[in-house]
Regions:
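Divalent cation-coordinating acidic motifs and surrounding scaffolds
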Residues: 1-254
C-alpha cells in the first residue's frame, strides 16, 4: 500500500496509523517505510509504504537522482521481497505529479523505470500514483503519446474513463497503476477505483473531508491454482493508492 500527499512534519501520523492498524486489524502486523519530505517550496509531501511485515520485506530503496530537476516530488523507489513462489519480488515506483508538468514528469518516469529495473535486474515493476493524467491536466492525444503508452510492455491497469475523483462534478482518471512485465501482468486478477463514499455511506462533503480522490487498487494472484481452482483473495497482494484515508483524524495532509 502506498500513501501520497503525506505532509506530517512531526512524524507522528504514520506511527499512530500503524498502531491503530495493528490494534484492530487481523491481517497484520503492519510496518512502514517512508521517504523524506519532498517539494520545491515550503509545501512538502512524502511517500509512505505500508505493508504486512510477515508477507513482505523491504530489500532496498532509494530516492531517484533527479539531476535535471524534472520532478517536483521525485519517486521514492522500493524493492520488496514477497513470501510468494509465484512472485518472489516486486518493485514499486510511486509518483505524484504536478498538474502543470504532467507530460514532462510522466515521460521522465520512464527513465526512473529503466533505472530501477536495471539496478535490481527485474522486469516486475509497478508505477503508481496520482498522475493527474486526464481532464485539463493532460489531453487524450498527449496521454497516448507518452513514452509509457508508446513503449511496449506497459499495461495501464486503471483504464481510461475510470473516475478516480470524489466530486460528482468531475469525472477524471487522475490516479493510475501501470504494470510492467509479462509475468506480473499474467497475475493480474482485477483493478479498480474504490468508491469509499458509497461503501461507507458518506455524503460528498463527508468524503471530501477524507479525500477528493478514490483509492485505486490492483488484485494480484500470488498462489498457483490447485486442480484448476484459483486461490482465494487472501492469497493476493492488494496495492492501494490512498489520497489520503483517515486524513482528518491523522493529519496526513493539510
Amino acid at each position: 500500500m502506498v500513501l501520497q500527499e503525506v505532509v506530517d512534519s512531526s512524524d507522528s501520523a504514520i506511527p499512530l496509523l500503524l498502531r491503530e492498524l495493528n490494534r484492530f486489524g487481523d491481517s497484520g502486523p503492519y510496518a512502514s517505510h517512508s521517504s523524506l519530505l519532498l517539494g520545491r517550496s515550503t509545501y512538502k509531501e512524502k511517500y509512505v509504504y505500508l505493508y504486512r511485515s510477515h508477507e513482505a520485506e523491504v530489500q532496498d530503496s532509494y530516492m531517484y537522482d533527479d539531476q535535471d530537476d524534472l520532478f517536483t516530488r521525485e519517486p521514492f523507489v522500493c524493492w520488496f521481497s514477497l513470501r510468494s513462489k509465484v512472485l518472489p519480488s516486486l518493485v514499486l515506483v510511486p509518483l505524484h505529479t504536478t498538474p502543470k508538468a504532467v507530460e514532462m514528469e510522466l515521460n521522465a518516469l520512464y527513465d526512473v523505470f529503466l533505472d530501477a529495473s536495471g539496478r535490481w535486474q527485474t522486469k516486475d515493476v509497478i508505477l503508481l500514483g496520482d498522475f493527474n493524467a486526464d481532464c485539463a491536466s493532460l489531453t487524450k492525444k498527449r496521454l497516448d503519446n507518452l513514452v509509457l503508452r508508446t513503449q511496449a510492455g506497459f499495461h495501464w491497469a486503471i483504464a481510461d474513463g475510470v473516475d478516480t475523483t470524489v466530486r460528482a462534478s468531475t469525472h477524471c482518471t487522475y490516479d493510475r497503476i501501470v504494470l510492467h512485465g509479462e509475468h506480473l501482468q499474467s497475475l493480474l486478477r482485477g483493478a479498480a477505483a474504490f468508491d469509499f463514499p458509497q461503501s461507507f455511506g458518506l455524503t460528498e462533503q463527508e468524503a471530501l473531508n477524507i479525500s477528493d480522490h478514490y483509492p485505486v487498487e490492483v488484485d494480484l494472484v500470488l498462489s498457483r491454482a490447485v486442480h484448476g481452482v484459483q486461490p482465494p483473495c487472501l492469497a493476493t497482494l492488494w496495492l492501494s493508492l490512498l489520497l489520503p484515508l483517515l486524513a482528518s483524524q491523522l493529519g496526513l495532509v493539510a
